[in-house]
Every structure is written in C-alpha cells, then in structure tokens.
Amino acid sequence: CEKMVEELCTRYGDLYMIWFDGGADDPRGDGPDVEPIVNKYQPNCLFYHNIDRADFRWGGSETGTVGYPCWSTFPAPCSHHKRIESQKDQIALLKQGDPEGKYWVPAMADSPLRGANGRHEWFWEPDDENNIYPLTTLMDMYEKSVGRNATLIIGLTPDPDGLLPAGDEQRLKEWGEEINRRFGTPLVETQGRKQRLTLNLNEKQPVNYCIIQEDITKGERIRQYKIEAKVNGKWQTVCSGESVGHKRIAHFESVETTALRLTVTQSVALPAISYFSAYNVTLK
C-alpha cells in the first residue's frame, strides 16, 4: 500500500486531497504508514484521515447535506481524535462542530451523483443513468452544504474506458448553470466590519434569498444574526440564524421590500463580513 500511495503522490502532479474512506490506520495498529508519504511528496494536500490527522471532518451523513448550525471549529485537532469522549459526542460534533473549538476542522458533505431512487452508488455500473440525481435534489444539497458553511464532494463514476459518462457530465453542467442562474448576479451587495449592514434596493421588489459570508481568515466571529426587510416603511424579520462562516445561504418567503438589513445580534469580536447580498430567485 505504501508503494501505491507513493506512486499516486509522485506521478500525477499536485493533489488537492487524498481521502482514505473509513480512515487509514497507522503502524500502531495494523495499517500502512501512509501519512509520512503524503507529507513528503504532497505537503499542500488535504489529508483525511487517521487518528492523528484529519484536515476536515465528515459531516455525519452521505446525503450531501450537513445540519445547522455548522461550525468550522472543533475541540480536537482531528475529527476522530481520542480526546473526544464518546461515539455519541463524536457524531454530534461531526454534524455541528463546536463554536468554542480551538481547531479549524471544517465540515465536508458527500454524496454520489448516482444516488437517486434509493441507489446510492459510488461506482460505475451499466444502465444506471436513470439514478443520476435530478437537478432539484442537487440544488437542495448545495444549499444545505455549501450554504451551511460546509464543502460538498460529489462522487463521480468513470466508466470502463476511464471517461465520465455523457449523462453525468451533462447533469454537472446543468448544475453549475443553475447555481450561476440563482446566485451569479445579486440584486445588491455590500461588505463591512460592523454589527449591522444595510442593502438598499432601487425600488420595491421581491427578495427570497440572502447570502452572508465572513472573512474566515479572522475566524468565525458571528454567533447569532437576523435579516430584516423594510416593508411599507417598517422593518420586519424574515429569517435568523447562528453559524455563518465561509457561506450562509438564507432562503425565506418572498417579500416585497425596498431594503434589507443584517444585524449580528451576538458575536465574539467585531464581525468581519466579506459579503452580504440579496436575490430574487425564480425556483423551477
């Protein structure tokens, strides 16, 4: 196994991530000693995982979604560390993280692309194209993973020729286009380091989504927030939440408004908001 990992790390250029599903044991157990090989040849590669190191954490399911709130910080340096007292504690921490955690271990959601109709297939099989997830399901995954401060990994299935099947490729293209259609052009946007930010629209118009992003180089400072819309001259709350981090996609009932206001109601330091934007998304 060590030779295989060395080949992978030396013959295929820079690797973004190497992921041992279920974990890579180490010489203290019965497993191969792979982490030093990755460290030597791919020092910038994300590693997942053994009992000493996990650069991110699994979000607790293979549905392509994570729970909410979802914090990037964690009480231990890796998600399967012996410091975590029980399996029950571990499962809860995998799903939500710990806002007071000292370590940066962000969540990862995963799902196979061919997971519809109860299939959940990680590897290619013939005549399986009807189990490619529909676009609506994939968008739901996106909003409940990336939109909840996690990353999203989709399992793709190369065919026996080493190629991605045309149906899979087409669905991925449609997915990218739909993400861009929904969130590529905001009605209005702003940023700032303050407790409150306001978006003023040119005229009254419907809004049903907002995106908030923190400058995560400063950590996750926001603990609670609310978004209000100005309706007939008065502010009314349209949604509220807790974790923001890299990205929070907030979906709420469409409201006709002239302005939106983000108020951070609880934080551990002055909020560093890198992006606050509003959208009117027509859902297909």
Which sequence ranges carry the predicted segments?
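Mature catalytic domains of secreted/periplasmic carbohydrate-active enzymes
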Residues: 1-232, 237-252, 263-280
